[in-house]
Amino acid sequence: MNWAFLQGLLSGVNKYSTVLSRIWLSVVFIFRVLVYVVAAEEVWDDEQKDFVCNTKQPGCPNVCYDEFFPVSHVRLWALQLILVTCPSLLVVMHVAYREERERKHHLKHGPNAPSLYDNLSKKRGGLWWTYLLSLIFKAAVDAGFLYIFHRLYKDYDMPRVVACSVEPCPHTVDCYISRPTEKKVFTYFMVTTAAICILLNLSEVFYLVGKRCMEIFGPRHRRPRCRECLPDTCPPYVLSQGGHPEDGNSVLMKAGSAPVDAGGYP
């Protein structure tokens, strides 16, 4: 994947995104992906090599490392970023499907044929639901991975020394983690950015649902008032004083030219 493809992909997503979604994309690809590629992999590059225990028992450092780091931070973050960005691809695919269907429709019925969609640039119908579900899925993925990190690493902590008593270690041994402070800082940074992304996704969900409710139940969809229902002109025919039907406009002309006896009308 090159940067030109990534730019085209982001422009396709931004075409149908709100301001909150554009902020989310910036946070993901600047504060999460770039930090992960540039810095995080370098920090965790020596995680097992420099995991040292004060014992010479063969296999003890390996089992202790697996006990305290069952899954590497870097691999969990990579899986998290992949799952978080997949829903945006689904939105792009749905948009491409709509545009291709519209193109085939005009090729079959002519350029003057009515469009299948009212406005391709608006989120309506199935595209609205795809977009909304993608937001919920992204928030759920980030929340799920935050819970996994919390369960695997208590309070996202990175201690300097851990005590290990797993077999085949002969007794409780102390194991030392390399660069614990630096790893803790990056862990807190990734957790904070994930929490910000969850907040942005949920805010956009409430915004979209609230906007749709306003469109459905808003003032413009209420029934018109009785004053607006009344016609602007008189009915075409009214009864004259003699009981014969007479044009309403002629009655108005008579009313303007001579006084009309109000007592003759019921």
Swiss-Prot record:
One of its GO terms (molecular function) is gap junction channel activity. It comes from the Eukaryota. Keywords: Cell junction, Cell membrane, Disease variant, Disulfide bond, Gap junction, Membrane, Palmoplantar keratoderma, Transmembrane, Transmembrane helix. Residues 41-73, 152-184 are extracellular. Pfam families: Connexin. GO terms for biological process: cell-cell signaling; gap junction-mediated intercellular transport; olfactory behavior; sensory perception of smell. Residues 2-13 dip into the membrane without crossing it. This is Gap junction beta-4 protein. It comes from Homo sapiens (Human). The lineage of its organism: Eukaryota, Metazoa, Chordata, Craniata, Vertebrata.
